[in-house]
Amino acid sequence: MPLEIEVSESEMKEFKESTIDDDLESVSSEETLTQSMVDVSEEDEGLYNDITVEEKPSGDGCEEIESDEGEFDYIPIFNERTIKEMLLPYSSWTEYLTNSRAILPSITFDDKSDYDLDMRGWRQFPLAPILAEKCSGIYFFLQTLSGKKLLVDGPTWVPVSWLVCTFANVIEEADTRDISVVSNEKLQRLWDERIIGPDNDRRRKEDSKARSRLTRREEHSEHHRSGKSRRERERRSSAVQEINRRHHKRYDSDDKPWGLKREDAIYQHRAGSSHGRRHHPY
């Protein structure tokens, strides 16, 4: 039989007030409250699905989307500058994953329970956004091949043919035959190949300059090769012209044994007619 204890109204009121005071002391500011909302271990991935932003942030890095309740939430979307600032302290993709609080989309599918598949070829693609602070954060989104952004902050069904992972400027289409094509190893390879990374633009420019120098060298070599053959053709043509010039020079003298004008002799010689040959014993 439970023990019954009578408590007066004054004691109950005093108890409630003391409890509220303790709670207020534990939360010193709105920032602390916001931080306590997001300081959750990465193991509890599902807890991030219901995170919403109440205030409308400013800046171009935000997009208005409609939530399940029909209301509009303003969700920050990362851009290239944000990604660069985010990756700046890290030297590799693996180090970024290890030290950052970001949760990548479940696209490696190491565990069969991570995804579901039906005959239509649709897979469940869970995305877990994390708010580092209020009105800012990292959002991985799906992007269709047509370039339309599809922002997701929870388990969402998407067609495999549209499944692409966009990070910085990289778009890799996932293949149904090899669902692990977009994996951490793949992203690490892209990092190593200077496709993604914090100093992406600088490395791209250096690679572009190197390719330009190589192309110019190849074009220069080709120009020299073609120049040699062109000069050879010109030399041969000049030799033929010199022979013709010397041959027709003799027709300029006054003692023309056959009485032809120079122009006629040249024409008949070049025409190669029997008449010309008869009048040109040389």
UniProtKB/Swiss-Prot annotation:
Disordered, as annotated region: 1-45, 201-259
Superkingdom of this protein's organism: Viruses
Record field: compositional bias (Basic and acidic residues): 10-19, 201-237
Lineage, highest ranks first: Viruses, Duplodnaviria, Heunggongvirae, Peploviricota, Herviviricetes
Name used for this protein in its record: Uncharacterized protein ORF56
Extent of Polar residues compositional bias: 26-38
